[in-house]
Every structure is written in structure tokens, then in C-alpha cells.
Swiss-Prot record:
It comes from Danio rerio (Zebrafish). Belongs to the protein kinase superfamily. STE Ser/Thr protein kinase family. STE20 subfamily. Residues 26-277 form the Protein kinase domain. GO terms for molecular function: ATP binding; metal ion binding; protein kinase activity; protein serine kinase activity; protein serine/threonine kinase activity. Its EC number is 2.7.11.1. This is Serine/threonine-protein kinase 3. ATP binds at residues 32-40, 55. Residues 297-339 are annotated as: Disordered. Residues 308-320 have a biased composition (Acidic residues). GO terms for biological process: apoptotic process; camera-type eye development; hippo signaling; intracellular signal transduction; negative regulation of canonical Wnt signaling pathway; positive regulation of apoptotic process; protein tetramerization; regulation of MAPK cascade. Keywords: Apoptosis, ATP-binding, Coiled coil, Cytoplasm, Kinase, Magnesium, Metal-binding, Nucleotide-binding, Nucleus, Phosphoprotein, Serine/threonine-protein kinase, Transferase. It holds the Pfam family Pkinase. The active site is at residue 145.
Length: 492
């Protein structure tokens, strides 16, 4: 439910408001979840009574990215893009005050209801999203992280683009960008290949988001993201798992988004004229879906509150029994829901299951620094960078960092390199499932299944390490040859 009706609509924070402490201007009500670079809270603007969202970002976070997000939001004025009202510094945090979208993200709604969206609902969401993209692209901006998690709905059903933490600006002197930034499963092929890209990279991501809204997850979500990054540029464009369940118009819309050649990919303006979007129903059809999701959210919050109260009571009892020798652990963060799920073969029903790879790998991937780009922006910039030095693809650094983080968290609890684990843990004669064919598993006994499950992570690490070694073996001779040529040129 929204808060009280605003006394007058907040357009921008006044100079007077910006000189005060944020607590004097806002009442913070509750934590909504985690966004790029910070936590997001629901708050009320005391003077107008309007509900807003406040992103609190630790100053030690990547300040350049935060400033970029603020800069892009400041320049935007569209009903299809989340509005920016102002910002504050408070202790070690930067407070960014933004428009509040009461229904949350489309991915939140899917998770809360345990259902995917219908075609009519998807068309309505896509129409607003395309209008937001048309506006951004007209302003020469690329969002670069379009996905269901970054499409927010207000309580009336209007969709708005959010989370500009990785958005980029195109200038007249720079037709294409060359940084790999975004979320792996939603990335356009040209972004992964680092061959330069423009606004239509967002259109590919929108096509993937269309499948995500229809099926509950993007294509390749069940495989390791590193493999996905190699498969997206080489495989044909992904399609629905069961195309016969969807109309010709919807299938054709997704097909036009997922054209591998960016020169042949449709623009946001062109897609707004597509029959699937032209025939979209008004936002009022989303109200039942939003009401159901918000009711589910309120119910879950009540259940969490009850559990916390019960835990507190139990803790107090245990403390008394143990004569104050027990240390009470902190409660879980009540942030954005992280449950993941897979879709059943039936219509729109999601079956929740335990933690999967999808849960830990759908976060935004910000890989290359734009430092060099920003410096070049100040002077003249070449249309197509032609540096003679061939650099290691930047997405490899991302996986190095992921592996490093896993090691720090005690991921290698066996205290040995998973790549060096004896092959007896996973014999070479084990059958590897192809294209999701897992029928042979039914014939295995429980112990063999358990053994396979235990060996899966080390097996994955070994395969990745072998892939890395093959890559290095191919790359090093090229670098050596280049160095030799450079030395000859210098001697010349």
C-alpha cells in the first residue's frame, strides 16, 4: 500500500532542503532491498507527504559509478524512467533520493507470486519499457543492464527503468563503446566480444528479458556463466523452450530483438510499432497482479516478524538457562528476496527449489573500468579504437575475481586445489548430460547420485581451469610474436 496522498507532488528537492540533515527532511520507513552499490530504503518526504526511495551508498564504494548514476538520472525527465530528486552526504554514506515504485521490480513480482507473466501482461510491461528505452536512446544513453530486476512498477502498473549504475553515455564523436558491462545472461553478443556496441545492445537484453518474464529465467541460466559468455556469441539466438505455447506475434517480437548482427537489430522506435506492442492492453490489467504480489509481500513480512519475535523469545529463554554464556547471533537481513525457482512444464507456475547457481550469478557484472574512456571523452576520440596491443578479454578478470572471492569464503573447504583432486572423485567414464538429457540418472543408485553431486563443483573448477590453460596456451605465442615485432621496430 502507498503512504498517504501527497500534499503537493515533489518534483525536486529545494535548496533549503538540501542544506538540512536528511533525517530532518525524510522519515525512513523500511528497507526495500539491495541495488547496485547500496541499500534501498522506503521513506516519506515530510513537507510534501510523498513516498520516495532512498539509496544509501557507502562512500568507500565506487564513487565514479555512483556519480555516473546520479548524472544520468539528473538528465532524464520521462514518465518511463525513475526520477531523481536530489542527494545528501550523511556520515560515511551518500543518500540518493529517487522516485518510489511501490510494486517493486518485475522479477520481485514473479518470485513473490511464484508465477510467470501472461502474454498480455508481458506486452503491457514491454510497451512502457520500450518507451523508456526510446527516450534514453534519443538522449544518446545506453542502459546496459536491462533485465526484469531493473524494470520497476508503481502501484498503478506503470513500468519504469531503474538502476543506472552501469549506464553509459554516447557522444557524437564516439559511436560505439568498448566496455563489457552488464549482467552475463542478458548480454548482447557484441558486448561480450568487445567489438564496440551502441544503443541496440539494450534491445538484445530486452529480448532476453521477454523470455525471462515468460519462463521465469533467462536462457543459459542453468549453466555456469563463464560457459554462457562463450556460448552467447557462438550459438544461434535463443528462443522459447516451448515456442508452441506462445503467439506468433510474441515469438516474432522476441526474434526481432535477438538478432545477432546489431546492424540488423530493430530499434526501440521500430519495436513500438510491432503488432505485439501495438496490441498491448492498458496498464490497468497489471493491477490484480500487483495487488497479489504486494499482499504476498506483506504476508511474508508478517511471517518474518513473527519468526524474529519467536527467535527473540527463544534466545531470552536460552540465555537464562545458560547463565548468560550464550552469544545471540544477528538476524537475517530483510532485504530483497533471493529465492530462485524453475518453471514447471505447465503454464505460469513456478516451483521453488533450493539455492542454485542462478542465485549467485545473476548479479550485475561490471568488468571494465571506463577511466580511459572518460579521459578520452575530454579530448578527441577515435570512432574505432585501433590499439595494437591485444588485451586479455576483460570478462576473464571477472571470473578470476569470482574464484578469489570463493576462496576467501572458504569455498575450497577441502584445503586443496579442486583442479588437483583425484580423478577417481569423478571418473572419466561418467556420462555427461547433453542438452538437458538427465534420464540416465534415474537408473543410478542413491550413493552414486550423492557421489556425483559432491564431485560436481570440483569437476566444474577443473573444466574451467583446463579452459583457462588452453586459452593461455593460444594467447602467449601471439603476445611473444607481437613483442618480437615491437623490439625489431624499436631497433629500426
Amino acid at each position: 500500500m502507498e503512504h498517504s496522498v501527497p500534499k503537493n507532488k515533489l518534483k525536486k528537492l529545494s535548496e533549503d532542503s538540501l542544506t538540512k540533515q536528511p533525517e530532518e527532511v525524510f522519515d525512513v520507513l523500511e528497507k526495500l532491498g539491495e541495488g547496485s552499490y547500496g541499500s534501498v530504503f522506503k521513506a516519506i518526504h515530510k513537507e510534501s507527504g510523498q513516498v520516495v526511495a532512498i539509496k544509501q551508498v557507502p562512500v568507500e564504494s565506487d564513487l565514479q559509478e555512483i556519480i555516473k548514476e546520479i548524472s544520468i538520472m539528473q538528465q532524464c525527465d520521462s514518465p518511463y524512467v525513475v526520477k531523481y530528486y536530489g542527494s545528501y552526504f550523511k556520515n560515511t554514506d551518500l543518500w540518493i533520493v529517487m522516485e518510489y515504485c511501490g510494486a517493486g521490480s518485475v522479477s520481485d513480482i514473479i518470485r513473490l507470486r511464484n508465477k510467470t507473466l501472461t502474454e498480455d501482461e508481458i506486452a503491457t510491461v514491454l510497451k512502457s519499457t520500450l518507451k523508456g528505452l526510446e527516450y534514453l536512446h534519443f538522449m544518446r544513453k545506453i542502459h546496459r543492464d536491462i533485465k526484469a530486476g531493473n524494470i520497476l512498477l508503481n502501484t498503478e502498473g506503470h513500468a519504469k527503468l531503474a538502476d543506472f549504475g552501469v549506464a553509459g553515455q554516447l557522444t557524437d564523436t564516439m559511436a560505439k563503446r568498448n566496455t563489457v558491462i552488464g549482467t552475463p545472461f542478458w548480454m548482447a553478443p557484441e558486448v561480450i566480444q568487445e567489438i564496440g556496441y551502441n544503443c541496440v545492445a539494450d534491445i538484445w537484453s530486452l529480448g532476453i528479458t521477454s523470455i525471462e518474464m515468460a519462463e521465469g529465467k533467462p536462457p543459459y541460466a542453468d549453466i555456469h556463466p563463464m560457459r554462457a559468455i562463450f556460448m552467447i556469441p557462438t550459438n544461434p539466438p535463443p528462443t522459447f523452450r516451448k515456442p508452441e505455447h506462445w503467439s506468433d506475434d510474441f515469438t516474432d517480437f522476441v526474434k526481432k530483438c535477438l538478432v545477432k548482427n546489431p546492424e540488423q537489430r530493430a530499434t526501440a522506435t521500430q519495436l513500438l510499432q510491432h503488432p505485439f506492442i501495438v496490441g498491448a492492453k492498458p496498464v490497468s490489467i497489471l493491477r490484480d497482479l500487483i495487488t497479489e504480489a504486494m499482499d504476498m509481500k506483506a504476508k511474508r513480512q508478517q511471517e518474518q516478524q513473527r519468526e524474529l519475535e519467536e527467535d527473540d523469545e527463544n534466545s531470552e529463554e536460552e540465555v537464562e538457562v545458560d547463565s548468560h554464556t550464550m552469544v545471540k547471533s544477528g538476524s537475517e537481513s530483510a532485504g530483497t528476496m533471493r529465492a530462485t525457482g524453475t518453471m514447471s512444464d505447465g503454464a505460469q507456475t513456478m516451483i521453488e527449489h533450493g539455492s542454485t547457481m542462478l542465485e549467485s550469478n545473476l548479479g550485475t557484472m561490471v568488468i571494465n573500468s571506463d577511466d580511459e574512456e572518460e579521459e578520452e571523452d575530454l579530448g578527441s576520440m577515435r570512432r574505432n579504437p585501433t590499439s595494437q596491443q591485444i588485451q586479455r578479454p576483460s570478462f576473464m578478470d571477472y571470473f578470476d575475481k569470482q574464484d578469489s572471492n570463493k576462496a576467501q569464503e572458504g569455498f575450497n573447504h577441502n584445503q586443496q586445489d579442486p583442479c588437483l583432486i583425484s580423478k577417481t572423485a569423478f571418473p572419466d567414464n561418467w556420462k555427461v548430460p547433453q542438452d538437458g538429457d538427465f534420464d540416465f540418472l534415474k537408473n543410478l543408485d542413491f550413493e552414486e547420485l550423492q557421489m556425483r553431486l559432491t564431485a560436481l563443483d570440483p569437476m566444474m573448477e577443473r573444466e574451467i581451469e583446463e579452459l583457462r590453460q588452453r586459452y593461455t596456451a593460444k594467447r602467449q605465442p601471439i603476445l611473444d610474436a607481437m613483442d618480437a615485432k615491437k623490439r625489431r621496430q624499436q631497433n629500426f
